[in-house]
Amino acid sequence: MAKENSFDIVSRVDMQEVLNAVNQALREIETRFDFRGSKSRIIFENKPEITLISDDDFKLRNVIDILESKLIKRGINLKALRYGKVESAAGDTVRQVVTLVQGIEQDIAKKIVKAIKDSKVKVQASVQGDQVRVSGKNRDDLQLAINVVKGTELDIPVEFTNYRTI
């Protein structure tokens, strides 16, 4: 009986690490001199979005820089962030919503499957909901498939999980 090896390609963000990064960013905003008297704040309620509020575009850009630096330190890939439009909010402030990408969208999943099939590696790739399953007989072929995916230009961070031998 031949053994089948497989792994999953997923895109997910650790919400606890995002919460930690947001708390660190808020602490820095509270203590920084250039934010004294500012209405700048970050709102994160364990939904896959972060709301940034600040006095003006310049301070909003600084809030984004602080948040991004804290996310990087916590191991969150910035490709997982989708920035919305900057819009006016109440009290002469500006607001921007940042969405956290969870799961692989259909068009990106198809791009991953196509890249693997075009590489002529002897594996099968299939879309399963918001992840891609790659299976093959040889572990070396799976490693080649991982390298193909890493070499493909994607708009999202990907992880390789759930290695199995069936």
From Swiss-Prot:
Check the record and name the InterPro entries matching this protein.
DUF520 (IPR007551), UPF0234-like_C (IPR035571), UPF0234_N (IPR035570), YajQ-like_sf (IPR036183)
Q: Which domain of life is it from?
A: Bacteria
- SUPFAM superfamilies, sorted: YajQ-like
Pfam families under this entry?
DUF520 (PF04461)
UniProt keyword annotations, A-Z: Nucleotide-binding
Query: Is Lipoprotein a UniProt keyword of this protein?
Result: no
MF terms in GO: nucleotide binding
A single GO cellular-component term from the record reads: cytosol
Protein purpose: Nucleotide-binding protein.
Q: Which family does it belong to?
A: Belongs to the YajQ family.
Q: Which NCBIfam families would you find in this protein's record? A: PRK05412.1
This one is known as: Nucleotide-binding protein Dred_1927
Provenance organism: Desulforamulus reducens (strain ATCC BAA-1160 / DSM 100696 / MI-1)
